[in-house]
Amino acid sequence: MVQIVIINGPNLNLLGRREVGIYGTKSMEQVMVEIQRMYPDIHFEYRQSNHEGDLIDWVQEVGVAHGLEDASLPFSGRPEGYGLEDACQEAVVCRSATPVDRPSGCSKEVKGIVLNAGGYTHTSVALRDAVACAEVPVVEVHISDISKREEFRRISLLTDVCAHTIMGHGTDGYREAVEWLIRG
């Protein structure tokens, strides 16, 4: 079974209640129910956190086939001192748009990640680095058109390391991201 992981960042737990003039009245639960109904043969996993480190951990967990959690330690087949930076560079060089099977024994093929990093879009170099290491496509989603928002929101640190970006289509952007991943 194909799996798509949707990761939302800070304040998106308040979707449907927060700044409804910008973000709309649909909750993320409603969005997920609609998406699951549209694509019953796909397993969706939804994660949300207001904490930057959680988003980084999840992108690494889902997006990097062999994980980078132990990359700071030398491991077999790697030279002494081979660390996270080397592993990340290797992952970036070997980056592929093909689905990755999780080594954990999970039978689901990860097709990609849909990422709405919220405010971390504009500030998190660490999240950008995690996305750059992803071996599955990451689609950046923004409910509003950040290019038409306040000056500080117009810069995305993620766009150039994501496979695709969708912005300004409301919560339909999540469905569009799923469709983009399915089309491959």
Regions found by a protein language model. Give the residues of each.
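Short beta->alpha junction loops
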Residues: 42-53
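Mid-chain, well-packed structural core segment of small domains
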Residues: 108-147
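A charged, well-structured terminal subsegment
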Residues: 167-184
